[in-house]
């Protein structure tokens, strides 16, 4: 048996006393009073911040949203089925933040920036607050570079600039998401990072969008943030802010980004659900009083940064669904007033076979031609006016039986112009192809063709120019101007192609 000397014991005790570190650890805790419907009421948590993350005993994380005199209202970021009355909660001292890095490109994540595509963890060393203040006036500069969507109707008449916020609005099943996804597909090779945020969508439609991106190589420069319809309201509410934080990370690193919110009205519904359960007073359409602020603080984060900050940009394209064309509902009017213009998609046009179903008459871009290259300004000037006059004449022509020759010609031209605006889904056009298409239509080169032949002729003309006269594309892309030389090349190509086309049609 080992005998321990008394002085050894005293040495050990002395050593331990010397090593003892008096560390006071203060933990801000509380107790669950009530839990259910994704909301927990907590007693305690005296020094909790608004929006602070709190952690429940069994691991669920929540956000403290309501700070009342007797309790704290917390929204849960999970189902919270294991939380019991009386269990303890501790404040983390952190506001909601997510990891950010280049490694997120090509991935599908949830509102907490956790991967949901089954391809393993995402490495990152930096963190960014989910909610951060928008750039101030001095930090911005006016929008001057175009963000090409690849859709003729938008790029020619409702141009979108880098750093702009343009609303895409229309009834369900009018092709809103298709316009947004085509815009992402068109950014290939243009050094633009895209973020697609799906809020409250069907999982099948999100999967379809992701597959479309993968097949066309767009996932290389795209991040998809998805919270589907079965996600807790808290996560649907957070998803757009997560997407904005990721886009901001790239924007402040002198990159151009584009973010699509599909759609903020679902976020507003999730926020309404949370607010009503937290017993906040309801306002118009039962939405809480700060639902405007919900969207304004999100969309104001889109900006074109000043040269001091590196001239990065974040272009926001929110998508809002209307009920039977009612643009005057609460959420649509809110978002219209926040954004710099809107693209209105009409169910009537969609059903009439005009796709993309953009109603050019009531769609606007408040940035306007500042976001167009010179070549596009040169050819697109007449297009909107001619289409507006055509729409007016068409309505008038329904009542008039005999029309003079000039009116008949104007109607024929208008029908062909409307035809050239039609495009297939996932087939965006480059700006050079758009310029030649619009020039061909507005200068009457399509007037002699049947309406059914217009699209076929234009497809063949674009192919003919690309293979036989590549210098046209070089002039437009290098000078960004529709020069006399480019016009001469184009006129010659149209003449040659028309002769070939007429011979083909006669042979058929």
Swiss-Prot record:
Highest taxon of source: Eukaryota
Topology versus the membrane: Peripheral membrane protein
Cell compartments where the protein resides: Plastid, Chloroplast thylakoid membrane
The entry's keywords: ATP synthesis, ATP-binding, CF(1), Chloroplast, Hydrogen ion transport, Ion transport, Membrane, Nucleotide-binding, Plastid, Thylakoid, Translocase, Transport
Top enzyme class: translocase
Catalytic activity: ATP + H2O + 4 H(+)(in) = ADP + phosphate + 5 H(+)(out)
GO molecular function, one term: proton-transporting ATP synthase activity, rotational mechanism
Cellular-component GO terms for this entry: chloroplast thylakoid membrane; proton-transporting ATP synthase complex
UniProt-annotated binding residues for ATP: 170-177
Feature type site, description Required for activity: 363
EC number, as in UniProt: 7.1.2.2
Entry keyword Chloroplast: yes
PROSITE patterns cross-referenced by the UniProt entry: ATPASE_ALPHA_BETA
Assembly notes: F-type ATPases have 2 components, CF(1) - the catalytic core - and CF(0) - the membrane proton channel. CF(1) has five subunits: alpha(3), beta(3), gamma(1), delta(1), epsilon(1). CF(0) has four main subunits: a, b, b' and c.
HAMAP family referenced in this protein's UniProt entry, alphabetically: ATP_synth_alpha_bact
Family (UniProt): Belongs to the ATPase alpha/beta chains family.
Known role: Produces ATP from ADP in the presence of a proton gradient across the membrane. The alpha chain is a regulatory subunit.
Protein name, UniProt field: ATP synthase subunit alpha, chloroplastic
């Amino acid at each position: 048996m080992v005998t321990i000397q008394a002085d050894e014991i005293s040495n050990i005790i002395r050593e331990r006393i010397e090593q003892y570190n008096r560390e006071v650890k203060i933990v801000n805790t509380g107790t669950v009073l009530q839990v259910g419907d994704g909301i927990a009421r907590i007693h305690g948590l005296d020094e909790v911040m608004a929006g602070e993350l709190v952690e429940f005993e069994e691991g669920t994380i929540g956000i403290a949203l309501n700070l009342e005199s007797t309790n704290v209202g917390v929204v849960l970021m999970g189902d919270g089925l294991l939380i019991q009355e009386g269990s303890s909660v501790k404040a983390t001292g952190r506001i909601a933040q997510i990891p950010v890095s280049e490694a997120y490109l090509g991935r599908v994540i949830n509102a907490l920036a956790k991967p949901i595509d089954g391809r393993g963890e995402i490495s990152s060393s930096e963190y960014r607050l989910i909610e951060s203040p928008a750039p101030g006036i001095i930090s911005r500069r006016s929008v001057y570079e175009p963000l090409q969507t690849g859709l003729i109707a938008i790029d020619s008449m409702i141009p979108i600039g880098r750093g702009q916020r343009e609303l895409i609005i229309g009834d369900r099943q009018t092709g809103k998401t298709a316009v947004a996804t085509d815009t992402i597909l068109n950014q290939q090779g243009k050094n633009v990072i895209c973020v697609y945020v799906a809020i409250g969508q069907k999982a099948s439609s999100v999967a379809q969008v992701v597959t479309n991106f993968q097949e066309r190589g767009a996932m290389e420069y795209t991040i998809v943030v998805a919270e589907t319809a079965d996600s807790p309201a808290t996560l649907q509410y957070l998803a757009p802010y997560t997407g904005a934080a990721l886009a901001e990370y790239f924007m402040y690193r002198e990159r151009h980004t584009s973010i699509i919110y599909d759609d903020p009205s679902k976020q507003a519904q999730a926020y309404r659900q949370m607010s009503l359960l937290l017993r906040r007073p309801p306002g118009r359409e039962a939405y809480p009083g700060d639902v405007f602020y919900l969207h304004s603080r999100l969309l104001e984060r889109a900006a074109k940064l000043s040269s001091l900050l590196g001239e990065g940009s974040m272009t926001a394209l929110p998508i809002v669904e209307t009920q039977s064309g009612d643009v005057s509902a609460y959420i649509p009017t809110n978002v219209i007033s926040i954004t710099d213009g809107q693209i209105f998609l009409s169910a009537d046009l969609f059903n009439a076979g005009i796709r993309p179903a953009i109603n050019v008459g009531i769609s606007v871009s408040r940035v306007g031609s500042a976001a167009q290259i010179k070549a596009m300004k040169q050819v697109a000037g007449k297009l909107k006016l001619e289409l507006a006059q055509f729409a007016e004449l068409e309505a008038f022509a329904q009542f008039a039986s005999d029309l003079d020759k000039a009116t008949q010609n104007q109607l024929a031209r208008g029908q062909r112009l409307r035809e050239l605006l039609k495009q297939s889904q996932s087939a965006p056009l480059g700006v050079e192809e758009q310029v030649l298409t619009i020039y061909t239509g507005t200068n009457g080169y399509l007037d002699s063709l049947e309406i059914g032949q217009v699209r076929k002729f234009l497809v063949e003309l674009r192919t003919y120019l690309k293979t036989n006269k590549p210098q046209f594309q070089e002039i437009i892309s290098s000078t960004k101007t529709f020069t006399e030389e480019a016009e001469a090349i184009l006129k010659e190509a149209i003449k040659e192609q028309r002769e070939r086309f007429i011979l083909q049609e006669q042979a058929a």
